[in-house]
Structure formats: C-alpha cells, structure tokens
Amino acid sequence: ASMLETNDELLEKKKSTDILLKEQEEKRARREKGIVMDAEDYRNLPVEVTSITVESCEDYKSEVLDFSRFKELIVLKIKPKCFNYPSVVKIEKLPKLKSIEIGENCFSSNSANSQLLVTDCPALDSLNIGNHSFSDFKTFSISNNAMLRSLTMGSFCFTEAEFTLKGLGGLETICLGEKCFEKSRHTLIEGAMCGMGVMVRLSCSV
C-alpha cells in the first residue's frame, strides 16, 4: 500500500510540474507578443517588443509607469479599467511609436502630482483616450511629437488638468469630449499650429 501511495504521490508531483511548466510557457509566449495580463507580465516584457496590449493590470502598484524602455515599440494599446494606481505615466523617447490607444476608465489616481507625459516620439501619428480616463490627473503634457496628426479624448478626461501642447507641427485635429479640461487653470499651445488649420472639435465621442 505504501508503494502505491508513493507512486500516486510521484504522479501527482509530475502532474503539478507539468502544469507549472505549461503555465510558464504560456506566460513566456504571451509576453513575447507584448500581451499584459498582470503586473508580473508588464515587468517581464522583452524590451524589444513592437506592440504592447494591456488586457488587465489591476495589481500594478507602482506610482510611476514608464514605457520609455521599449525603444522598438510601434503600437501601445491599453484596454479599459487598467492601471488604477499609477500617478505618473511616461511615454517618452520612443522613436518608432506610431499609435497610442487608451480605453475607458483607466488611470484613476487623484494624486496632486499626477501627470501624463507624451514627449519626443517623432513617429507618433495618433493618440486616443477613452471616456473617464485620467479624470483626476493634474497635468497633461504632450510635446515634440512632430508627426502627430490626431489627438482624441472621450468625455470627463483631465477635468482639472493643466494642458500643454508644444512642438506638434503636424497636428490636424484635436477632438475633446464633454468636460475635458473644464476646470483647467493653465493651457499652453505653442508651436502646434505652424500656420496650418487645426480643427478643434468639442464633445466628441470616441
């Protein structure tokens, strides 16, 4: 009987090991594709990924979220209801980044120092932010993204934020949803127009 029990235990251990190995392989394959399901995925993404899709990341508890290490990144997509905790979001010095898409109800920190910084991304073409994302952030600065053509936000984004636009010579359209920057105390638009017509639309739906 004891031998049978030992065999059963060995089989159980092997089964557990096989499951663990399978889970590790699935995580590795997922991360190689730039898919994020939790904070561990994000921390272990290969720096050479060209696309990042954040499906879920409620357990990310750092105040700073910095994408700047991903120098090969072309597409950044964050699905709804992600990243409730970070108060400083940096998307900076990414030479190949073309598209940023952030879903609804992301980034809900109301820290006094909360800020979104999108700077020095020379290939960036479009930035889209869904309803109620960054609602209580205090600063939104987007600068030195010469190829950016379209900036779109849903409703209730950055309701109290200082808004800075600088060095956006290619900008064609700014589309702001309801209540965006409604209580903003400071807005700076510098070098964004370059004599070209920029269409600004209010109360847009994303």
What are these regions (language model features)?
Residues 72-77, 90, 96-99, 117, ...:
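Discrete beta-strand positions within long extracellular beta-solenoid architectures
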Residues 42-86, 94:
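LRR N-terminal entry segment and analogous cap-like coil->beta motifs
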Residues 54-59, 78-84, 102-108, 118, ...:
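Concave beta-strand-loop units of leucine-rich repeat
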Residues 10-11, 15-56:
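N-terminal capping/linker segments that flank leucine-rich repeat
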Residues 38-46, 63-69, 89-92, 116-118, ...:
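Leucine-rich repeat
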Residues 4-5, 174-177, 185-206:
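Leucine-rich solenoid repeat scaffolds
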Residues 47, 68-71, 84, 92-95, ...:
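Inter-repeat linker/turn residues at the boundaries of leucine-rich repeats
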